[in-house]
């Protein structure tokens, strides 16, 4: 079970949002590269970056902190990034810079052909981010709820050749209200590629619940507010996950 610290970038800072609301940002660090090094030192095996300004603008907006993070930890662990990735040139520039995985969210839903092209052009490097509320997909930084069913889209995107799916229950994200294990397992059972849980992970019991369903295809979790506010000790959580799943 891979536990992945999240670094959400807004205006060059490391922040956390509540339910995706940009106006509800808590600043946790003015130095995202130092934060990346902090998680590496605590044993993180991968980092999850989100360009929040980019997600709104539809193009990368935090180039300097992203470069600083890659300079700090890029030789040591894989780094994945999402937010505002709408064209193949952006993907190529990220991969050339040292990013290991690029996460496509809104663009995959609005323009499936783009996702298909990306999976073909950069096999093994494309992860799809599916953000949902009550089983329906949300787009545009979660501001728009669609009629698309999560399971249907996941299967379609798997067929395109994406590497993995990050599933976020947006009603729980940043709320520390507990991970939606049932919905995550339903999705994982529906596809053959790895699924990573995101949103609402509040403490060790959530990690243990996810470890119990690893064999269903839930292979990891993105950790945000819980590890920044101290509700979850990252080192202890990864150690417990290793104990339960190895």
Swiss-Prot record:
GO cellular component, one term: cytoplasm
Keyword Cytoplasm belongs to the record: yes
Gene Ontology MF: a single term: 1-(5-phosphoribosyl)-5-[(5-phosphoribosylamino)methylideneamino]imidazole-4-carboxamide isomerase activity
Keyword Isomerase attached: yes
EC id: 5.3.1.16
Gene3D superfamilies, per database record: Aldolase class I
GO annotation terms (biological process): L-histidine biosynthetic process; L-tryptophan biosynthetic process
Reaction(s) catalysed by this chain's protein: 1-(5-phospho-beta-D-ribosyl)-5-[(5-phospho-beta-D-ribosylamino)methylideneamino]imidazole-4-carboxamide = 5-[(5-phospho-1-deoxy-D-ribulos-1-ylimino)methylamino]-1-(5-phospho-beta-D-ribosyl)imidazole-4-carboxamide
Places the protein is found: Cytoplasm
Metabolic or biological pathway: Amino-acid biosynthesis; L-histidine biosynthesis; L-histidine from 5-phospho-alpha-D-ribose 1-diphosphate: step 4/9
Record: active site: 8 (proton acceptor), 131 (proton donor)
Keyword annotations from UniProtKB, A to Z: Amino-acid biosynthesis, Cytoplasm, Histidine biosynthesis, Isomerase
Enzyme superclass (EC): isomerase
CDD domains attached to this UniProt entry: HisA
The family this protein is said to belong to: Belongs to the HisA/HisF family.
PANTHER family referenced in this protein's UniProt entry, alphabetically: 1-(5-PHOSPHORIBOSYL)-5-[(5-PHOSPHORIBOSYLAMINO)METHYLIDENEAMINO] IMIDAZOLE-4-CARBOXAMIDE ISOMERASE
NCBIfam families recorded: 1-(5-phosphoribosyl)-5-[(5-phosphoribosylamino)methylideneamino]imidazole-4-carboxamide isomerase
Entry-linked HAMAP family: HisA
Designated name of the protein: 1-(5-phosphoribosyl)-5-[(5-phosphoribosylamino)methylideneamino] imidazole-4-carboxamide isomerase
Organism per entry: Bordetella petrii (strain ATCC BAA-461 / DSM 12804 / CCUG 43448)
